Structure formats: C-alpha cells, structure tokens
Amino acid sequence: INNGYGSWAYWNGGAAVSNYHSTIAEGTSNTQLSIPADLAAHSGSNFLMIFGSIDGYNAPVLDFKDGKAHTMKGLWITNGTYFLNVMANGNDFCAKAKSSTQISVVFEGFKADGTTSTGTVKYTVQDGTNSLKSWQYVDLSSLGEISSLKVNYEASEDMKGKYGYNAPAY
C-alpha cells in the first residue's frame, strides 16, 4: 500500500480489509468501505476494498509479502455501495451513469523491478446504466509471474471532470 502520506495513505490510494455492508441508497463517502447489504463477502466474512484513481500515482499497488514473484490465478470483484449510489443518482462531484458510461477496473502486473509491466487485464464494472452488483471472477493468469499488482480505473469522458476521474474509485 502506498504510504507516502503516512496515516493518510488510504486517501492516496490503497486497500483496507472490511466487513461493512449498507444499502445502495446509503452509499456515500461515509460508507465507502461497504458492499450492498444483501451481498455476502465472497468467501469468509471479510473482503478487500481497494481505492484508487484513474491517474497513475494514486493507483494502489499490492505487493507479495515474501517479495517473490507469483502467478495469480485471479480474484473476485464487485462494486461498493458508494460507487453504486453515485452511478444510480449522481452526487455533487459526478453525474449519474448514462447509456454511454463505461468504467473498467484495470489490473496490471509488474516484475520485481517494479517498472516492467507483464500486461494488463480489464474488467468492466459499469456498462452504460448497468452496474456490477454481484461477485464476478477476473482471470489474472495471463499476467504471468508478478511481484506486484497495480489496480486502476479506465473511464469514459462523461465520468471525468476538470481534475480527472469523478466517480468513486472503490
């Protein structure tokens, strides 16, 4: 996790283990670590909530604790309630999703040097007005052996503003 800002690291992109749930209507910045109340964690009672941004420097990077390269088979993803509420209703920072809205999560693998990319895998989490609201498996095996995984977003122009990506990046 990027800890360049000390205790504010999560603000700058990062990951947090959570077990919070809320309704989509309650999805605000106060419930940013929540998934829908009717959706259980995929396995166990906790899940990892990742926060990032469309710019390169705020993207969270997950490193393997042992410092060795590994081949990741894949992972399960879903959207958080903050993202889902904004896509359905908009907020002060972002308009609600429309038919042309496209948002994908981009997973990028890196070799031990931290700069050599092994490739990317994209998964669409918002297609027009349709939001991902269930757990979906993302196959990451094509990234090969990686020492770290960067998680970022790619979005259509209607989700960007003067300062970049405006939708919640959770």
Predicted regions and their residues:
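N-terminal targeting leaders for non-cytosolic proteins
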Residues: 1-61, 67
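Intrinsically disordered regions, especially transient/low-confidence alpha-helical propensity segments
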Residues: 5-8, 73, 132
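Short, surface-exposed loop and linker segments with low hydrophobicity and enrichment for Pro/Ser/Thr
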Residues: 35-45, 97-100, 140-146
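A structure-centric signal for secondary-structure junctions around beta-strands
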Residues: 43-46, 69-72, 102-104
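Secretory/extracellular carbohydrate-interaction modules
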Residues: 53, 73, 77-89
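Extended extracellular/luminal ectodomain segments enriched in beta-structured repeat modules
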Residues: 67-74, 145-146
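Short coil-to-beta strand junction motifs in C2/discoidin
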Residues: 86-105
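Terminal, low-complexity interaction segments
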Residues: 104-170
